[in-house]
C-alpha cells in the first residue's frame, strides 16, 4: 500500500500558481483515508489545494500538531469547507500561547464546534497504518525548543513546554515514517518514543520542521549526531528548520536529505 504526502503549505514555493507562507500543512492520502496534518496560518492551504485539484471536502481527519497560529490559523476555514472530518488534537491545544509578548495560539476557540473534536492522550490508530503519538517524552534536553515561548496558567505566564504537541506516524509493513510539524519537544526525542513503541522497526521517512532555524549550530549538531545512528531512508526538512540547516543536513547525509516545499509530493 502506497501513501501520498502532498505539502499544501510551507514557507517556500516553486510551482507556478501556488503560494507559500510561514506555516505548514500536509495532506496524507493512504488510498482509503485522507488526513490533513495542520492548516498553516490562513486559508492558503485551501487555495493551494484547489490549484492542485484536491477537494478538501473528502478529508476524513484533521490532525493538529500543536496550538501555534502558523499551524492552526486555517482551522476555522477548514471547518467551513469540510463538514465531516474529526479534528484530532490534545486538550492542551487551547491553552493560551505567546511568543514573547505576542499572542500565538488558536484563534477564537470559543467559536469552534466542539462536537467535531477528538482529544487524544494515548497512542491512537486513526485508520489503518496511521497513528497519532500524543505523549512525547523528553530523553535529551539538548534537543528541546522552548525559548521565548510562554503559556498562561492561573493568569500568570510560564514557560511553554509544549505538552500539546503530537506527532503523526505512518506504519507500512515493517517500516515507519514520522511526521512532526515543529518538533518543539525535539525530533530526536519524538523518534525515540516512536521506536520504543515500534521496536526494531526501520525508519522510512522523517518529515517536518525541527525548530533550529536561527539557532546556534550546536542545536543542529545534536540532531545530526542522532541521525548518524538512526538515519531514515528519506529525511525531509522544512518550515522552522531553516534553509541554512537544510544545507548542513545535505552536507552530512547527501541526497537522503531533501527540502520539503509547498506543492511537493512524496510517495511512500
Predicted feature residues:
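Conserved beta-strand hairpin/beta-sheet module of binuclear metal-dependent hydrolase folds
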Residues: 3-52, 161, 165-180
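Active-site metal-binding loops of divalent metal-dependent hydrolases
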Residues: 10-12, 39-42, 67, 92-93, ...
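Short, small-residue-enriched loops and turns at beta-alpha junctions
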Residues: 13-16, 156, 212-216
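A short, polar/proline- and glycine-enriched secondary-structure boundary/capping micro-motif
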Residues: 46-51, 143-144, 188-192
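Cap/insert and terminal regions of metallo-dependent hydrolase folds
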Residues: 68-71, 161-178, 182-262
Amino acid at each position: 500500500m502506497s501513501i501520498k504526502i502532498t505539502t499544501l503549505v510551507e514557507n517556500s514555493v516553486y510551482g507556478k500558481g501556488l503560494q507559500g507562507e510561514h506555516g505548514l500543512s500536509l495532506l496524507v492520502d493512504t488510498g482509503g483515508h485522507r488526513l490533513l496534518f495542520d492548516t498553516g496560518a490562513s486559508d492558503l492551504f485551501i487555495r493551494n489545494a484547489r490549484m492542485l485539484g484536491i477537494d478538501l471536502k473528502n478529508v476524513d481527519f484533521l490532525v493538529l500538531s500543536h496550538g501555534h497560529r502558523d499551524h492552526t490559523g486555517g482551522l476555522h476555514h477548514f471547518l467551513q469547507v469540510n463538514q465531516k472530518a474529526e479534528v484530532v488534537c490534545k486538550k492542551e491545544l487551547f491553552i493560551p500561547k505567546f511568543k514573547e509578548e505576542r499572542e500565538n495560539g488558536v484563534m477564537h476557540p470559543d467559536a469552534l464546534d466542539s462536537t467535531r473534536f477528538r482529544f487524544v492522550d494515548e497512542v491512537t490508530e486513526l485508520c489503518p497504518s496511521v497513528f497519532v503519538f500524543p505523549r512525547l517524552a523528553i530523553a535529551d534536553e539538548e534537543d528541546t525548543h522552548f525559548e521565548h515561548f510562554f503559556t498562561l496558567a492561573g493568569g500568570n505566564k510560564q514557560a511553554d513546554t509544549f505538552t500539546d504537541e503530537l506527532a503523526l506516524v505512518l506504519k507500512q509493513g515493517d517500516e515507519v515514517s514520522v511526521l512532526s510539524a515543529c518538533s518543539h519537544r525535539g525530533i530526536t526525542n519524538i523518534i525515540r518514543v516512536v521506536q520504543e513503541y515500534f521496536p526494531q522497526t526501520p525508519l522510512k521517512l522523517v518529515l517536518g520542521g525541527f525548530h533550529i532555524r536561527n539557532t546556534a549550530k550546536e542545536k543542529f549538531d545534536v540532531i545530526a549526531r542522532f541521525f548518524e545512528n538512526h538515519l531514515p531512508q528519506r529525511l525531509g526538512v522544512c518550515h522552522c528548520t531553516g534553509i541554512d540547516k537544510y544545507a548542513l543536513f545535505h552536507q552530512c547525509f547527501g541526497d537522503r536529505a531533501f527540502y520539503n516545499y509547498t506543492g511537493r509530493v512524496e510517495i511512500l
